[in-house]
């Protein structure tokens, strides 16, 4: 939501059901689709998440991203640009046991132009937003000094992606020091 409360950003996909696959009630007409489904439906451009902008009154719906990449978690920056995460960088997460796409920080103008990658990190980054000083705050799956199953920790970076750093320092918490806090 913009600071003036007039415009919303969101990510949307058709969830693998094209118009030809839906019944009149909007439910999938293919009996293999649903809870019993053992495989992902085949990829199509319509099944990728894309970023949209719309006025709170429902007018002016505009798709801002396109292509074969998933674009998620859009949020406004104080300068009017949009920060989001995307698979556009390419690459795969390091230790998932199988190829899992990598999501990193990106930004673009409010009209979807001038898209830039903000991060070169080799792990997933999630939920970007802006703090009161205009810095981008996000969570990052980071393996430095902690196991693979630790919680994602908060990070901060400049709006142009410079100087990314952990907010609280990069340390592995000791469960002995705080037994009530379980991070696994």
In which residue ranges do the predicted regions lie?
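Conserved beta-propeller blade repeats
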Residues: 1-4, 70-82, 122-137, 171-184
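Blade-loop segments of beta-propeller domains
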Residues: 1-12, 29-33, 60-70
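Residue position within the beta-strands of beta-propeller blades
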Residues: 7-16, 53, 63, 81-87, ...
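Short, conserved, GDST-rich strand-edge loop motifs in beta-rich repeat architectures
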Residues: 11-47, 84-101, 138-152
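Beta-propeller blade signature
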Residues: 30, 41-58, 99-112, 151-162
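Multi-bladed beta-propeller domains
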Residues: 56-70, 109-123, 158-177
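Hydrophobic, small-residue-rich alpha-helical packing segments that form membrane-like cores
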Residues: 79, 87-90, 105-110, 115, ...
């Amino acid at each position: 939501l913009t600071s003036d409360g007039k415009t919303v950003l969101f990510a949307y996909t058709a969830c693998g059901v094209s118009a030809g696959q839906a019944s009149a009630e909007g439910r999938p007409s293919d009996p293999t689709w649903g809870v019993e489904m053992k495989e992902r439906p085949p990829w199509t451009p319509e099944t990728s998440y894309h970023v949209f902008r719309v006025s709170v009154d429902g007018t002016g719906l505009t798709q801002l991203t396109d292509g074969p990449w998933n674009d998620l978690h859009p949020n406004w920056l104080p300068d009017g640009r949009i920060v989001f995460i995307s698979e556009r960088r390419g690459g795969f997460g390091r230790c998932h046991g199988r190829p899992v796409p990598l999501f990193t920080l990106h930004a673009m103008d409010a009209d979807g132009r001038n898209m830039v990658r903000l991060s070169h990190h080799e792990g997933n980054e999630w939920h970007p937003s802006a703090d009161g000083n205009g810095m981008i705050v996000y969570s990052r799956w980071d393996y430095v000094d902690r196991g693979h199953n630790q919680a994602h920790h908060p990070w901060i970076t400049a709006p142009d992606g410079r100087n990314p750093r952990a907010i609280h320092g990069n340390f592995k918490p000791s469960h002995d020091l705080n037994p009530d806090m379980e991070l696994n």
